A protein has these predicted regions:
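N-terminal accessory segment at the very beginning of proteins
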Residues: 1-245, 249-255, 260-263, 268-276, ...
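Short, well-ordered loop/turn elements at secondary-structure boundaries
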Residues: 30-31, 72-73, 79-81, 90, ...
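Aromatic- and carboxylate-enriched substrate-binding clefts and catalytic-loop regions
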Residues: 51, 57, 281-562, 597-599
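Short, solvent-exposed loop/turn segments at the edges of secondary structure
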Residues: 89-91, 173-175, 188, 219-221, ...
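Short, glycine-/Ser/Thr-/acidic-enriched flexible segments
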Residues: 92, 185-187, 198-200, 233, ...
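Short, hydrophobic/amphipathic alpha-helical packing segments
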Residues: 156-159, 174-177, 272, 395, ...
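Catalytic core of carbohydrate-active enzymes
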Residues: 450-455, 463, 470-480, 491-494, ...
Length: 745
């Protein structure tokens, strides 16, 4: 993709049109109005161009007061807390300072005539497209931009923020995008940028065909609307971004257990048989999914009517599954088959996206031999209309259509797809498909999330969905899984990177299809186990794919190892709940890439498939056959959870893991609350959830909020451990002098 600079008008000169408590409006030489607003310490908004089209509520934060000062020659300064935004004119450019040091600024790549190679701020002469360019220091990494399956560091890449059914995890295409990126900076502070738009954004992140020393954004919308962030750390940037775009909601405890699924259970009797077998084989599990073709007639879906041939009595069928202490997840997508009775009904109400002529827009799936994703198991999907969630009536209708499903016994919805809005579709709110496309899955999942909140039987637990597509704001409606990975080792590695990249984009929850979704052959037992072991440490865990994915399908030895690691997963739930509480408060993900957890450490950040689970556990997934993996240990000291051996940090460790072992390390100074090995979360006693407290070396951090254990700081700066009589404290490392006090509960 080339960048035609001659097509752009550069913005320059800044003349005051007025100031306010939170910013200023400035006139430019092109006649465009450049508006600057403060959104609290560390966050500034730069907006130029008209704002006549829907913004879809992507931003929930509000402007806040800041100090505004006008200098000479059209210069301006805006200060909030420790962060200052400086603007200069001719040409228009910015500099962002944090604690007095510059952390980000406009492009410095100059043409030999003295102009910058690309506009620092510019628009296409005919309007409707904008660009902005920022300077990058040599070697400065950039992260985020949604769920991307390639390298986490986007430096050198041309990245498109465009939601698409990626049909796998092997390309730059992705189901979940967010035009939000950040850099740990060069030692003076971190910075971030969010492009506030539902439209397509192209990011040239040190892309050499444009400028290897610049980060260039190209926005296909009527206005350029940017938010700039500055903070001490990348965690601070994510905190600012999620303050602005919405904090993640919490999730129910049962959702942290195992989800079992396949494409697909042919009959409810087969699903009930699997449910019984899970209990007979002592496989811990909480949710069973009736996937795409398991509940509905393919020819009429989705009409919210059970297939009458297979589900003559749906409540009885679901009760047979739920009798095994399982929740039920049911698949849907936001499309209506053209021959369904619902099609004419919804069309007559204006509840469907239309063509320019006002007819319902009919979407056809690719059925071309050689390119179609469909086959013998996953048969072609029917031509369908697309529900228009911008229509208030359609939104309410779709939400309330779920009532009967939840009354029948459904607990949660797998809200699949949502990536298919065509550019030339027309929405009720006046937008075209080009602008609606990216935010459509956000509106769709919001609707299903609200349906769950309204109709679920457990009124005292948080609602959730199991969604695939997303955009900025999707963190408000958890959770999303990583789509359809290929069943091989590269599919595993890419799925891990996708989850970490989504987490670096301000979304704390992620899962993937253990074993992979598709492939020319079924996953090997080794691949299945390594995928499962890695996903034990993600926020959510599900086995799924075309064909059997239940542990017993891979042999008795594999089943035994899977059972062991699933038991460990359930024991982790008290810890995961603490990590999730932090996610809700700050936006930090459960799975934390090395560049996010240790942003200043150049050794570890290049290891892009290892991650922190919360702040206490280092996870180094095995992503190749044979069990060998290199582990880059961050600073400090680390305890192998298998051998209990202590390893000094800031080194690379070559690790060989037997099939029943997995490289996980506890961080010295931290503690790990461990629960019981149960068969489902309903067996967890909320008054006594802990069985053990694992302490890695001498504690250096407090642990509070648990009923049965704590670590508190004494007046002399040391930390004391307390535990109830029924909680065993496991001390890793030298325990000399460490005293454990008994708590009364």
């Amino acid at each position: 993709m080339t960048f035609d600079t001659s097509a752009y008008v550069r913005l320059d000169t800044l003349q005051s049109l007025g100031t306010s408590a939170s910013g200023a409006s400035l006139a430019t030489s092109t006649g465009d109005i450049f508006e600057v607003s403060c959104y609290g310490p560390g966050a500034f908004r730069l907006r130029v161009g008209p704002s006549t089209k829907p913004d879809y509520g992507l931003v929930v934060g509000r402007a806040k007061p800041c100090e505004v000062a006008q200098g000479e020659g059209g210069a301006w300064k805006f200060t909030a807390g420790e962060t200052t935004l400086e603007l200069a004119a001719t040409p228009l450019r910015f500099r962002l300072l944090h604690r007095g040091a510059p952390v980000a600024g406009s492009i410095t790549d100059e043409h030999f005539r003295g102009w910058t190679r690309l506009p620092s701020f510019g628009r296409v002469r005919q309007g409707g497209q904008w660009t902005a360019a920022f300077a990058l220091a040599s070697g400065e990494p950039v992260y985020g931009l949604g769920e991307k399956f390639g390298p986490l560091n986007k430096r050198g890449q041309l990245v498109h923020s465009w939601v698409v059914d990626a049909l796998g995890v092997n390309t730059g295409l992705s189901y979940k995008n967010a035009p939000f990126a950040w850099s740990p900076g060069t030692g003076k502070g971190a910075w971030g940028v969010f492009v506030h738009t539902p439209a397509t954004v192209t990011h040239g992140v040190g892309y050499p065909d444009w400028s290897h020393r610049s980060y260039v954004v190209h926005v296909d919308d009527e206005a350029l609307d940017l938010f700039l962030f500055a903070a001490d750390t990348p965690a601070g940037i994510i905190d600012l971004y999620t303050q602005l775009t919405g904090r993640p909601a919490s999730v129910p405890m049962w959702g942290l257990g195992l989800w079992v699924s396949r494409a697909y259970y042919k009959t409810p009797e087969e699903a009930a048989e699997v449910a019984a077998k899970l209990r007979a084989h002592k496989i811990p599990c909480d949710v069973l999914t009736l996937d795409g073709r398991a509940a509905w007639k393919v020819e009429t879906r989705v009409d919210f009517e059970w297939d009458p041939d297979r589900f003559p009595n749906p409540r009885a069928a679901l009760a047979a599954i739920k009798a095994h202490d399982l929740r039920i997840c049911v698949w849907e997508y936001p499309y209506v088959w053209v021959h369904s009775p619902l099609f004419a009904d919804l069309a007559s109400r204006g509840y469907l996206l239309t063509t320019a002529d006002g007819d319902p827009y009919v979407f056809g799936w690719d059925t071309t031999p050689g390119t179609s994703p469909f086959g013998k198991v996953l048969t072609p999907l029917p031509e369908s209309a697309i529900v228009d969630f911008t229509h208030p009536g359609a939104y309410v209708w779709w939400r309330d259509a779920h009532a009967a499903l939840f009354a029948d016994g459904v607990d949660v919805i797998k809200s699949d797809f949502g990536e298919q809005v065509p550019d030339d579709a027309v929405a009720f709110n006046g937008d075209d498909g080009r602008r609606l496309h990216n935010v459509y899955p956000l509106l769709y999942n919001q609707c299903v999330f609200e349906a769950t909140a309204k109709f679920q039987r457990d009124r005292d637990v948080a609602p959730m969905v199991w969604g695939r597509a997303g955009w900025t704001g999707s963190q408000r409606y958890p959770i999303q899984w990583g789509g359809d990975p290929q069943s091989d080792w590269e599919g595993l590695a890419a799925s891990i990177r996708g989850g970490l990249s989504w987490g670096m984009s301000g979304v704390p929850y992620h899962s993937s299809d253990i074993g992979g979704f598709y492939g020319s052959q079924q996953p090997s037992p080794e691949l299945y186990l390594r995928w499962l072991q890695a996903t034990v440490f993600s926020s959510h865990i599900r086995v799924h794919g075309i064909g059997e994915r239940e542990p017993w399908a891979f042999g008795a030895d594999t089943e035994a190892i899977a059972r062991k690691w699933l038991a460990f997963r359930y024991r982790l739930i008290p810890y995961l709940q603490r990590v999730i509480a932090e996610a809700v408060a700050t936006g930090m993900p459960v799975m934390r890439a090395m560049a996010l957890a240790f942003p200043g450490n150049t050794l570890t950040r290049s290891y892009e498939t290892q991650f922190m689970c919360g702040d206490a556990l280092l996870v180094a997934p095995v992503i190749q056959p044979g069990g060998e993996v290199e582990v880059a240990l961050p600073p400090g000291a680390w305890y192998d959870l298998i051998s209990r051996q202590r390893f000094p940090g800031q080194r690379v460790l070559r690790y060989k893991a037997a099939l029943d072992q997995f490289p996980v390390f506890g961080r010295e100074g931290y503690a790990l609350p461990m629960g019981f090995a149960v068969q489902h979360t309903g067996e967890i006693d909320p008054a006594k959830p802990l069985e053990q407290l694992w302490v890695f070396g001498r504690p250096t951090r407090p642990l509070q909020g648990l009923l049965q254990a704590n670590i508190v700081e004494a007046s002399d700066g040391t930390f004391a451990i307390g535990a109830a009589a029924d909680v065993k404290v496991e001390l890793f490392g030298d325990a000399a002098g460490i005293v454990v006090a008994k708590l009364t509960t």
